[in-house]
Amino acid sequence: MVTEPDAAADLGDNDGFLAEHAAAIHSATSRIAGHVRRTPTLPADEIATGVAVKPEMLQPTGSFKVRGAFNAALSLLGRSPDARGVITVSSGNHGQAVALAARNLGLDCTVVMPEGSNPVKVAAVRALGARVVSEGVTGANREERARELQERTGLAMIHPFDAWDTIHGQGTIGLELLDDLADLGTVVCPVGGGGLLSGCAIAVKAARPDVRVIGVEPELAADAAASMRSGRHERLAAPPATIADGLRSLSIGDRGFEVIVRRRLVDQLVTVTEDEIEQAMLAVWTRLHLVVEPSGAVGVAALMAGRIPPSPAGSRIAVVLSGGNVDPALSARLLAAHAARLATGGSAP
């Protein structure tokens, strides 16, 4: 499904907003330099002609989340040099990123993760020295539990998506795409809580309002598309059962809603099926030789399904591959099915 705003974005109303937040994203680039990797932008004609990918699985914790985590933690220390620790909620990737930032900056760290979270990601958070709180935690109550712990411990909250410091850090990806691709025509980002999409939209639209920004989410977690259709901040009734565990937020954040829906800085939101996500993962693994997780593959899934409109002639489509922390059991299942299909004369994705 493809969803567009009711009316074309009026960027004239957004000039001050864009200038303020684009400046903060530029500051974040300088702040996090030396703490995160400046990932390359790679041609991906093996996926489709005129496509490039941003492989954020090459970051130290395997996802883009280190950008927002380090920007938030460093900004915290700039404001409160005596801060002793941080707390966050996460399904995995953000938790790893905050744990790494906390360890490297000498801060205590607690990560509230729902029961049943990806065991690879839970183990990785613990390996980085963070305390994991999961007992009785669900996707629906995790933020409430984190706020309770924050009040008891005095730790500073680093929100995974609904905080400007986090959004500004994620927006550094947009600046890098602009630097790398003079012929950039379209940016495609996953959307869960909306931090990555919002940050990239601000960075791109502030410099190049002609570049289209498209968000992609699973059909089973299509709250952002519902919000764009209705103009209201829609929320899912229960945690979605999508394979894309990093995109299981019940809703986009308040700040994401402002950027994506109210200010119309995102041109389209599209959705993809679970099978399309799996086929996209296999395509990235086998064609680009990059390990991408389900959440990171949704942009390629939309592209392969024909839901991303062609860019204007001569311009590129840049797809953000947001992470590569895959559950080994899922990898084994997909690769076994792929091998069986090839063995019986089936085609590769």
Residue ranges: model-predicted function:
Residues 1-349:
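PLP-dependent amino-acid enzyme catalytic core
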